[in-house]
Amino acid sequence: IGQKTALVTGAAGFIGSHICHRLISDGYSVVGIDNLSSGKLSNIPAGFDLRNADLRDPIVREIVVEIQPDVVLHLAAQMSVAVSAREPLLDADINVVGTLNLLEGVRAIEDKNVKFVHFSSGGTVYGEPTCLPADEAAPVHPLSPYAASKLAVETYLPIYERLCGLDHSVIRLGNVYGPRQDPHGEAGVVAIFAKAMLGKSPLKIFGDGTDERDY
């Protein structure tokens, strides 16, 4: 059995880079796609096969067909809720159209069952959860364009299963934290609080302090 190949989108980002390091240590041949709009080259190993491309570029389909991956781990996204509210067309273009571009590349591969893992939006697809903790069967009620675009991709995956037999999984991560996380973002609450504490800055908590951050 030959070496397996993994394609990771958003490979230079916080989570994507950790996945790349793990896959390499597990013996995979790894190719990454990232336009470096938020990812950093310093996050990935020297000599790593990184293709600088936007998810919406036609070349993404060519890369998928070229490398014939055994598994695609899809993390690249427009990830700001605030940006999605200001520019919902941009958000949908990147998160929905960009993902469809990637899926069409997978669909073009013949005689190979590619595993597709979509890293979705975490808890935002639930909106205001009706029960806590929310599990996979909990009702979804997106309240932002970002949440709607990520949920839209989730609904496309079973369609691609019918179209081309796509083997797919969806992962909704909540409150991920760790090394290489950007402490300046809007959602990395652990990194933001840690940076404030290290800098002896006040922690800003909105509301009455009873809000629950995770799901």
Give residue ranges: language-model regions:
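NAD(P)-dependent short-chain dehydrogenase/reductase
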Residues: E128-L132, T155-Y215
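N-terminal Rossmann-like NAD(P)+-binding domain of SDR-like oxidoreductases, especially those catalyzing
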Residues: I1-V176
